[in-house]
């Protein structure tokens, strides 16, 4: 009799011990948390250049190139501008790249923030706060752009700007290839999207090109590529 009672009590204890497990196992799954919508692309490096060296058809032609690539990538509802400065010429004042690109924030094709605003992009308050680097400075297709260590190296990006995004002193053919209308004589200021090469590894102002032709741009590690920003 005592043995029977003990067995019954042991069986009851086992049943009670399994109740919490069964309750947990049968509990409905927690509802999925809503995902934040992806941030729209507001920055990219052009996957291709215009193809005529630094003759981009002026600022308007460069903007048109950025817009066309954005349209092809499904981001054509936004207004796109090339990150380029222009020198004072023909009675017109200089144009600063930083004044052409809106106020930010800008995200790459994968939703990674590149900079929250113009000041952060250019390090006005603290240097190197932006996210323009090889793993994140993607083209409009979401692909990395070739840099140092890749063949061909294409880390030279046309800017015509100083490190603060402003037009540089001098005639138009000394830093902007005739305000982006020359594929022959002149030079253009270049940045390095991978921050490698040169004493000043700046994303927007490292060194001048050896000339304005397509061959000149390729010779120093470029392809006539542009930084493109959405202004809205």
Give the location of each predicted region:
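Bacterial N-terminal signal peptides that target proteins for export
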Residues: 1-12
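Intrinsically disordered/low-complexity terminal segments and short unstructured peptides
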Residues: 1-3, 17, 135, 158
